[in-house]
């Protein structure tokens, strides 16, 4: 989501309409906050704005409880408190984020980074014994985030042992303004203040704050500075000076200071207005905030200022540094809003050492639907717990789980790799199929070739070609998948100049579409007739094999899938009842030149070459995940030591569960560390064009989170 500057008022269609006169109950935690709230209420009444009432409680915790029980509706929380408020039993969610910065450069978060001199030859996992510079004790960018990140390397078993003592022993010298210099003198030994001001958490200590931590590094009082990414630019406007520094990345690489959005310890979120996750008053809350910032925001002539507090007071109701609000997309809950890196850093400070180490070594796989979960549970048992499992109904749910750290990995097709990449995930290993150009010994290091996306038809169903598909019935693997949706529908959209896919075909089965639409009319659900059009294996026409089944059972006239699907399910290769008598010769392919060809001639008759499926994860998990999966496939891969005797990664009872069944191995993908590099420029451009045809709540959420 982009900030619409200069107004900073996001006038959505709903916001332009007259909102219902629903009273928003704002929760205040002090007499001063209540006084400001009552004045806000009075000023809104004067200008005919949305109704507001004020509720006073004695603590933030009591306000949270009041919101849960409908005795209040909204309040503003910082990240740490929001972390607790988002969990059961409260389950509050962010409705609007405070915006900081300027109209020209607004921001809803900042990046906590580790800065070193360009001549440094150490990585983030090699800081022990070096000198450190911090913004201050207990502060996010200078303490909580870096120390939480370094938690696995500290000789600290967790509470109640002193964290400060462990840090003082980890670094040789430090400046941590605000630390107890009598108890932990090493934490103050690098500070530059004099007398009582040495190590003070105030401007009197030259090395205090964001700029101070960087100054500590520049003065050679430390080897690494933990500060804010933008601080380097604020303090070093000269490019030649900036180029003398670089960043330490969580994956133990270096990047230029200009790339702090890609190389940071955590993204620290701004304060946010929270409410109940039931969404009963979200529209009213946003309309109140929208009109309030328009009438009483920064630089308004009104005597009442929304982002100001009386003399002697600070940050009443909202941060005084805020310049406005931005609406938080519905898909963004507290876990997504706070980001994995932020929440993990905070959580690590409350964990035992062995738990932190165990969580970093463990891989949690995300399974889509019950059948994938069953196979994953078998993998869990065979791996002796090295791989654990979690399950969600849809692929997008799994992508969100990986973003939040509830899961670590899954294998995706190109369409979902595109989505995952927009959400900050990266490809780790690619599914590699057999190649006629080489033997299986080089599979792990062999470049992936991609697969052929085709339009399959029954040979007997003659009389139509690619250009005469309009009005036919279609079978798709699922919405947003490569061979089954992105490629064919992208081609059709370009040809017809229309996004009305539900009108192009008379009926379809496109799992993941609106169940009430024509795009789901051919779907059959599970054996009980339930879960119709579900984007998982409960829909029997879902996936490559499901799309072929839809065609074979004469529900559809054309199936969009990959060429190998037909080869793997005909002439006795699939013994399921629906496929038992299928013959390869009974199917043909539609070519873009309006001819038909046998399936065996797919190289000369396909819609596009599609990128192979790939395993995706967060950047912090790449190294561990690659090690674990390469070890697992030695044991359970094709011709593995314990396959087929115990478990096989690339075999499925009902086809293509977790991985494609025709996968020979999971292969390394050097040099393709982002989804865009892996997918290729042409595929990305084509997918972006197709995405213009529809809205995606997940892509909207990820655009907001990565802006």
Curated annotation (Swiss-Prot):
Species of provenance: Mus musculus (Mouse)
PANTHER family noted in UniProt: LACTOTRANSFERRIN (PTHR11485:SF55), TRANSFERRIN (PTHR11485)
Protein name, as recorded: Lactotransferrin
Reported modifications of this chain: Poly-N-acetyllactosaminic carbohydrate moiety seems to be needed for TLR4 activation.
Gene Ontology cellular-component annotations: cell surface; cytoplasm; extracellular space; protein-containing complex; secretory granule; specific granule
PROSITE patterns hit by this protein: TRANSFERRIN_LIKE_1 (PS00205), TRANSFERRIN_LIKE_2 (PS00206), TRANSFERRIN_LIKE_3 (PS00207), TRANSFERRIN_LIKE_4 (PS51408)
Record-listed Fe(3+) 2 binding positions: 413, 451, 544, 613
EC numbers for this chain: 3.4.21.-
Family named by the database record: Belongs to the transferrin family.
Gene Ontology biological process: antibacterial humoral response; antifungal humoral response; antimicrobial humoral immune response mediated by antimicrobial peptide; bone morphogenesis; defense response to Gram-negative bacterium; innate immune response in mucosa; iron ion transport; killing of cells of another organism
Record keywords: Disulfide bond, Glycoprotein, Hydrolase, Immunity, Ion transport, Iron, Iron transport, Metal-binding, Osteogenesis, Protease, Repeat, Secreted, Serine protease, Signal, Transport
Single GO molecular function: peptidase activity
Cystine crosslinks: 27-63, 37-54, 133-216, 175-191, 188-199, 249-263, 366-398, 376-389, 423-702, 443-665, 475-550, 499-693, 509-523, 520-533, 591-605, 643-648
Binding annotation for hydrogencarbonate 2: 477, 481, 483-484
Predominant location: secreted
């Amino acid at each position: 989501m982009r900030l619409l500057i200069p107004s900073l008022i996001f006038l959505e269609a709903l916001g332009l309409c007259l909102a219902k006169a629903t009273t928003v109950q704002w929760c205040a935690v002090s007499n001063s906050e209540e006084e400001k709230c009552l004045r806000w209420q009075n000023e809104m009444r004067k200008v005919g704005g949305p109704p507001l009432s004020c509720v006073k409680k004695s603590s933030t915790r009591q306000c949270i409880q009041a919101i849960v029980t409908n005795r209040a509706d909204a309040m503003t929380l910082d990240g740490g408190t929001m972390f607790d408020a988002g969990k059961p039993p409260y389950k509050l969610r962010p409705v609007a984020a405070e915006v900081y910065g300027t109209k020209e450069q607004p921001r809803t978060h900042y990046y906590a980074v580790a800065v070193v001199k360009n001549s440094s030859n150490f990585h983030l996992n090699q800081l022990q014994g070096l000198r450190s510079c911090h913004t201050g004790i207990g502060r996010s960018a200078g303490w909580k985030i870096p120390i939480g990140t370094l938690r696995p390397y500290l000789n600290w078993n967790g509470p109640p042992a002193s964290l400060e003592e462990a840090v003082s022993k980890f670094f040789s010298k430090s400046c941590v303004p605000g630390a107890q210099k009598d108890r932990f003198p090493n934490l103050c030994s690098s500070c530059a203040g004099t007398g009582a001001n040495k190590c003070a958490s105030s401007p009197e200590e030259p090395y205090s704050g964001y700029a101070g931590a960087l100054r500590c590094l520049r003065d050679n009082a430390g080897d690494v500075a933990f500060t804010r990414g933008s601080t380097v630019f604020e303090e070093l406007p000269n490019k030649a000076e900036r180029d003398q520094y670089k960043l330490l990345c969580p994956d133990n690489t270096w990047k230029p200071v200009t790339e702090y959005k890609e190389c940071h310890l955590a993204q620290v979120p701004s304060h946010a207005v929270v409410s109940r996750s039931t969404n009963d008053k979200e529209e009213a809350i946003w309309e109140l905030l929208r009109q309030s910032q328009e009438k009483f925001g920064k630089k308004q002539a009104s005597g009442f200022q929304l982002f100001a507090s009386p003399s002697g007071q600070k940050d009443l109701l909202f941060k005084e540094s805020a310049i406005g609000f931005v609406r938080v997309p519905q898909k963004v809950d507290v876990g997504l809003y706070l980001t994995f890196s932020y929440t993990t850093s905070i959580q690590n400070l409350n964990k035992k050492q062995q738990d932190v180490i165990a969580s970093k070594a463990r891989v949690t796989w995300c399974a889509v639907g019950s059948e994938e979960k069953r196979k994953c549970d078998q993998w869990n048992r065979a791996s002796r717990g090295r791989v654990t499992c979690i399950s969600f109904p849809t692929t997008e749910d799994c992508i969100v789980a990986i973003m939040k750290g509830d899961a670590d990995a899954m294998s995706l097709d190109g369409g979902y790799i595109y989505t995952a990449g927009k959400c900050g995930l990266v490809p780790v290993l690619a599914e590699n199929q057999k190649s006629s150009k080489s033997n299986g010994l080089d599979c792990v290091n062999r470049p992936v070739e991609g697969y052929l996306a085709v339009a399959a038809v029954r040979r007997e169903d003659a009389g139509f070609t690619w250009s005469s598909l309009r009005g036919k019935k279609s079978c798709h693997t699922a919405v947003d998948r490569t061979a089954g949706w992105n490629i064919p529908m992208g081609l059709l959209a370009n040809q017809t100049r229309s996004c009305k896919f539900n009108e192009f075909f008379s009926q379809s089965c496109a799992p993941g579409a609106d169940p009430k639409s024509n795009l789901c009319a051919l779907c059959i659900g599970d054996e009980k007739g339930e879960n119709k059009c579900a984007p998982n294996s409960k829909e029997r026409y879902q996936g490559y094999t499901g799309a072929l089944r839809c065609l074979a059972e004469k529900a559809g006239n054309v199936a969009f899938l990959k060429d190998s699907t037909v080869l793997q399910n005909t002439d006795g290769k699939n013994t399921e009842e629906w496929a038992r008598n299928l013959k390869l010769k009974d199917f043909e392919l539609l070519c873009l030149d309006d001819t038909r060809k046998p399936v065996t001639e797919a190289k000369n008759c396909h819609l596009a070459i599609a990128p192979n499926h790939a395993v995706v994860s967060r950047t912090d998990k790449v190294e561990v995940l690659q090690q674990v999966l390469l070890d697992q496939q030695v044991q359970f891969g094709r011709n593995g030591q314990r396959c087929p005797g115990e478990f096989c990664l690339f075999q499925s009872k009902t086809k293509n569960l977790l991985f494609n069944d025709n996968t020979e191995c999971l292969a390394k993908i050097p040099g393709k560390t982002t989804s865009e590099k892996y997918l290729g420029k042409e595929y990305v451009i084509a997918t972006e064009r197709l995405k213009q045809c529809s809205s995606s709540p997940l892509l909207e959420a990820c655009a907001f989170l990565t802006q």
